[in-house]
């Protein structure tokens, strides 16, 4: 059941979200140690200006799932708050389906869904179903259409019995599924997800990921996902935007990133021989461990088989272990490249 239709005049191939050179600054009180400094600041407080986001620009097409990643304090949450209309940019502009999140707020909020993994819009002492009914009234939804949408979401997320229990009695995974359902009752065109699988078990994570993929594929819901779980990114997004120190550092395809950084292979060579003075192009790093040698090679320069054949000719190799790069390793190397 597709519960969302593209608005008249909406072209999926065109930019649906356009962020143009946005900056967000905060005035933060200076804090110096010592009693004298504390007394001075009591009478005359000094401030410094902190740039949380600096000249950020990007465009997102309708129906895309984009991973918006970066270390803590990089500016991810600040960007999401500006996109969702919670914060006003200090400078720059945001247009989402030709709407300004601040100036067109009343119309805009009816077209977005927001899920913060560590915050809840569900009332804890009542069943989630009661909050759903409250949201129906807040968004002034037609009851017949609301019931159809609720049935669709509840079945898809497997929460038929869960929504009848008080929220405080639910597990984290159950609550998160209810949170996601509540954010989609009004059929938003965009879903902002901030750490949607934080603290969830493997089964709950799979349910959430499968659900996001389904509504994106069938209903063309545009999804912006911020998370530290790179498995979420790999499972859902084809494109990532990396932000660091408030600036966009990388915007591109995950496959391209894997080609660039995923060519490094970690190889453990178990041997009693002493391996030294080995001159082979493609060796990035070699270090001696207690009972093996650890090599990192660039498989774009030398293949694993070629590397191993060169070693086996000269040394008596007892065992070999080859570790493939995970998405976490790839992202970590990207962070290291930008010194984050």
Tell where the protein language model's regions lie, with residue ranges:
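Conserved ABC ATPase "signature" region
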Residues: 34-41, 133, 137, 144-162
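Conserved ABC ATPase signature
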Residues: 166-170
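Conserved catalytic motifs of ABC-family nucleotide-binding domains
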Residues: 187
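Catalytic Walker B motif of ABC-type/P-loop ATPase nucleotide-binding domains
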Residues: 191-195
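ABC transporter nucleotide-binding domain
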Residues: 209-298
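Short, charged/small-residue-rich alpha-helical element at the C-terminal edge
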Residues: 266-340
């Amino acid at each position: 059941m597709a519960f969302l239709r593209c608005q008249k005049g909406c072209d999926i191939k065109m930019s649906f979200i356009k962020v143009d050179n946005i900056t967000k600054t905060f005035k933060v009180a200076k804090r110096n140690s010592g009693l004298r400094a504390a007394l001075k600041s009591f009478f005359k407080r000094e401030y410094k200006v902190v740039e949380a986001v600096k000249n950020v620009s990007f465009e997102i097409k309708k129906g895309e799932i984009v991973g918006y990643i970066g270390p803590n304090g990089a500016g991810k949450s600040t960007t999401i708050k500006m996109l969702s209309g919670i914060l006003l940019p200090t400078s720059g502009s945001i247009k989402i389906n030709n709407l300004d999140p601040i100036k067109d707020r009343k119309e805009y909020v009816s077209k977005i869904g927001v899920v913060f993994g560590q915050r809840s819009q569900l009332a804890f002492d009542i069943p989630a179903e009661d909050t759903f009914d409250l949201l129906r009234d807040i968004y002034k939804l037609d009851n017949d259409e609301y019931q159809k949408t609720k049935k669709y979401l509840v079945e898809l997320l497997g929460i038929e019995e869960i929504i009848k229990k008080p929220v405080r009695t639910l597990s984290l995974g159950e609550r998160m599924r209810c949170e996601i359902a509540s954010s989609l009752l009004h059929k938003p065109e965009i879903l902002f997800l901030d750490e949607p699988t934080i603290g969830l078990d493997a089964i709950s994570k799979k349910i959430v990921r499968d659900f996001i993929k389904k509504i994106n594929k069938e209903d063309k819901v545009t999804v912006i996902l911020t998370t530290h779980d790179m498995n979420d990114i790999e499972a859902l997004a084809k494109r990532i935007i990396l932000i660091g120190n408030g600036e966009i550092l990388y915007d591109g395809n995950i496959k391209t990133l894997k080609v660039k950084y995923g060519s490094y292979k970690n190889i453990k060579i178990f041997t009693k021989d002493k391996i030294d003075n080995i001159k082979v192009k493609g060796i990035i790093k070699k270090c001696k461990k207690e009972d093996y040698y650890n090599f990192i090679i660039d498989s774009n320069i030398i293949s694993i088989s070629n590397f191993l054949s060169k070693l086996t000719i000269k040394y008596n190799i007892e065992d070999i272990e080859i570790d493939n790069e995970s998405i976490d390793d790839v992202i970590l190397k990207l962070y290291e490249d930008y010194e984050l």
